[in-house]
Amino acid sequence: MGKVAKRIKNIRKDINFNELYALKDAVSMVKERAIAKFDETIEISMNLGVDPRHADQMVRGVVHLPNGTGRNVRVAVFARGDKAEEAKTAGADIVGAEDLFESINGGAIDFDRCIATPDMMPLVGRLGKILGPRNLMPNPKVGTVTLDVANAVKASKGGAVEFRVEKAGIVHAGIGKASFGVEKIVENIKAFASAVIKAKPQGAKGEYIKRVAVSSTMGVGIKVDPATVRSE
């Protein structure tokens, strides 16, 4: 048996893939199996009872995880003048205007989150085909089109996670690292789930949270009882 096959066999050992585990138990199992040589990201995936092809069933938002994500989030900001200086002071990794536009248009996308002041949106909007599919387009609904660029940068650096439902009705996100304690991961997942629940669209009918699973970067998905992800 090869090394990869052996590793997968060990990861899958003692997991009942037909069972719905309590959140805390599932997180513990994922952590125990996160044995890669790097600090694996813990991820949550939620299947929702929505059809995002309909405008009244779109789910999107932003949540501030209480224990952060554990990763270094690179932030790009479209701004000029004083706002550009505010962004730099707040810790933005890339700040610019036309120069940043040209860089992105040329294929240089070295950031995880993009923020813009309102006056920059006519320029940024021209990058829709590049930023949109990567979920990087600034949007006022999630606080990334704003005059308060300093706080937006700090929020992005401090654990803000943007989410958006995909075509199949799935929303997912990295919510911590394998090095986090179980309780911290559980707290982050409950905060994320709470934000998704609050973002339930009026057009959603029937069961909203259908399935939940947690996994690590190199691990397998473990099914979670949806009732256990809700905040008490």
UniProtKB/Swiss-Prot annotation:
Please give an example of a GO cellular component term from this record: cytosolic large ribosomal subunit
* Alphabetically ordered keywords of this record: Repressor, Ribonucleoprotein, Ribosomal protein, RNA-binding, rRNA-binding, Translation regulation, tRNA-binding
Q: Which GO terms describe its biological process?
A: regulation of translation; translation
Molecular-function annotations in GO: rRNA binding; structural constituent of ribosome; tRNA binding
CDD domains in UniProt: Ribosomal_L1
Q: Which Pfam families does this entry report, sorted A to Z? A: Ribosomal_L1
Subunit structure as annotated in this protein's UniProt entry: Part of the 50S ribosomal subunit.
Family the entry assigns: Belongs to the universal ribosomal protein uL1 family.
Instruction: Quote the PANTHER family the UniProt record gives.
Output: 54S RIBOSOMAL PROTEIN L1, MITOCHONDRIAL, LARGE RIBOSOMAL SUBUNIT PROTEIN UL1M
The record ties this protein, via HAMAP family, to:
Ribosomal_uL1_B (MF_01318_B)
State its role.
Answer: Binds directly to 23S rRNA. The L1 stalk is quite mobile in the ribosome, and is involved in E site tRNA release. Protein L1 is also a translational repressor protein, it controls the translation of the L11 operon by binding to its mRNA.
This one is known as Large ribosomal subunit protein uL1
- Its source organism is Bartonella henselae (strain ATCC 49882 / DSM 28221 / CCUG 30454 / Houston 1) (Rochalimaea henselae)
